From Swiss-Prot:
GO terms for biological process: response to acidic pH. It comes from the Bacteria. It holds the Pfam family Voltage_CLC. CDD domains: Voltage_gated_ClC. Residues 1-4, 75-145, 201-221, 279-290, 337-351, 401-418 are cytoplasmic. Probably acts as an electrical shunt for an outwardly-directed proton pump that is linked to amino acid decarboxylation, as part of the extreme acid resistance (XAR) response. NCBIfam families: PRK01610.1 (NF002437). InterPro entries: Cl-channel_core, Cl-channel_volt-gated_ClcB, ClC, ClC-type_chloride_channel. This is Voltage-gated ClC-type chloride channel ClcB.
Length: 418
């Protein structure tokens, strides 16, 4: 047992450095090509001229597509093993390391050029790759899946500053394939990754700063649960839209570079209306949580951002949709809260409360992982007073979504790329 905990610690350290490496590479490219040192792609887009704002995501998608197509032609074969940590966990615990690194580099290109795709997907993949590389060198084959799971959980902890949620995400996704005893190393890796990441970044701040002064009352629990029902209906709709957009792009029968460029061009066009469509949505989420906008502003940004996410994911841009899903959930919750706020004197607090609830419940509805979703929002914001209500709402959202749409966002993604 001591041996496993020691390896879990090493995996956590490796994962933290993998995530930090990707983050610093992203910041470097943003500084070189966008003259942006704020770390916010929305700020970068705001400061660009309209023609650069239009073309930059398209050029980034084109470059990523050329890289992926060039690698496939160079090797003259498709990847001989998984290039996704979820697939590796569901098969024999091995990666195609070279193809996975190329995929991560392609993700770096589309992320830094403004596509509405999550950067954390590549971060978690790199963390899992580092764990897998170490495991194949120093551990027996039957443990490889465990250490990939530890690496993925550690990557999520370092990226989202949510070690418990990262650990439970792995446990919920792998329910039935991992023994409960295996959670120990997973949690150790996640916590170590968070601590090392804090040391690297010289900060232990929460991912999102929220000033929620409301004390949750019976009325608020009713509103939280009703938001869970709404998210349970919206989750399957979002997954259906993503699948339809993916099939639409595939039906065009474009070469990968042009397909990714088209997705980027759509994001560029939308950014002419609002630069908030650039990036994974992190900075927009923070601005909404700091000062919830008016109903029509939320609705406008929501529609543009939703279309940008659908275009980016549908075109096959390498990256995650975890953080974009958080923004969509926040917007849905805030739209609902703003509508209800017309009849309540504390409309601002209700809007913020239901925005946080929307983040958790839509995440639960799309991942079918309610416990992870609840803990993730609490860990990212520090609002642990919401935990009981969020847990009930997330379970309801997950049950409704699973009834209407059997596959989670991860199973759907695997099916699309298999």
């Amino acid at each position: 047992m001591f041996r496993r905990l020691l390896i879990a610690t090493v995996v956590g350290i490796l994962a933290a450095f993998a995530v930090a490496g990707f983050r610093h590479a992203m910041l470097l490219l943003e500084w070189l090509f966008l003259n942006n040192d704020s770390g916010s792609l929305v700020n970068a887009a705001t400061n660009l001229s309209p023609w650069r704002r239009l073309l930059t995501p398209a050029l980034g998608g084109l470059a990523a597509g050329l890289l992926l197509m060039g690698w496939q032609k160079f090797t003259q074969q498709r990847p001989h093993a998984p290039t996704d940590y979820m697939e590796a966990l569901q098969t024999d615990g091995q990666f195609d390391y070279a193809a996975s690194l190329v995929k991560s580099l392609a993700s770096l290109l589309v992320v830094t050029s403004g596509s509405a795709i999550g950067r954390e997907g590549a971060m978690i993949l790199l963390a899992a790759l580092a764990a897998s590389c170490f495991a194949q060198r120093f551990t027996p084959r039957q443990e490889w899946k465990l250490w990939i799971a530890c690496g993925a959980a550690a990557g999520m902890a370092a990226a989202y500053r949510a070690p418990l949620a990262g650990s439970l995400f792995i446990a919920e996704v792998l329910f039935g394939t991992m023994m409960l005893a295996s959670l120990g190393p997973v949690i150790i890796s996640a916590v170590v990754a968070l601590l090392v990441s804090n040391l690297i970044n010289h900060s232990d701040a929460l991912l999102y700063s929220v000033q929620l002064s409301v004390t949750v009352q019976a009325r608020d629990y009713a509103l939280i649960i009703s938001t869970g029902v709404l998210a349970g209906l919206c989750g399957p709709l979002l997954l259906t839209l993503m699948n339809a957009c993916h099939r639409g792009f595939v039906s065009l029968k474009l070469a990968p570079p042009w397909q990714l460029a088209l997705g980027g061009l759509i994001v560029g066009l939308l950014s002419l209306f609002t630069p908030a469509v650039w990036g994974n949505g992190y900075s927009t989420v923070q601005s909404f949580l700091t000062a919830p906008p008016l109903l029509m502003i939320i609705a406008g940004i929501f529609l543009c951002k939703l279309c940008a996410v659908l275009a980016s994911s549908g075109s096959g841009a390498p990256g995650g949709v975890f953080t974009p899903t958080l923004f969509i959930g926040l917007a849905i919750g805030m739209l609902y809260g703003r509508s209800l706020g017309l009849w309540f004197p504390d409309g601002e607090e209700i809007t913020l409360l239901l925005g946080l609830t929307g983040m958790a419940t839509l995440l639960a509805a799309t991942t079918h992982a309610p416990i992870m979703s609840t803990l993730m929002i609490c860990e990212m914001t520090g609002e642990y007073q919401l935990l009981p209500g969020l847990l009930i709402a997330c379970v309801i959202a997950s049950v409704i979504s699973r009834t209407l749409h059997r596959d989670s966002i991860y199973r759907q993604h695997t099916a699309q790329h298999s």
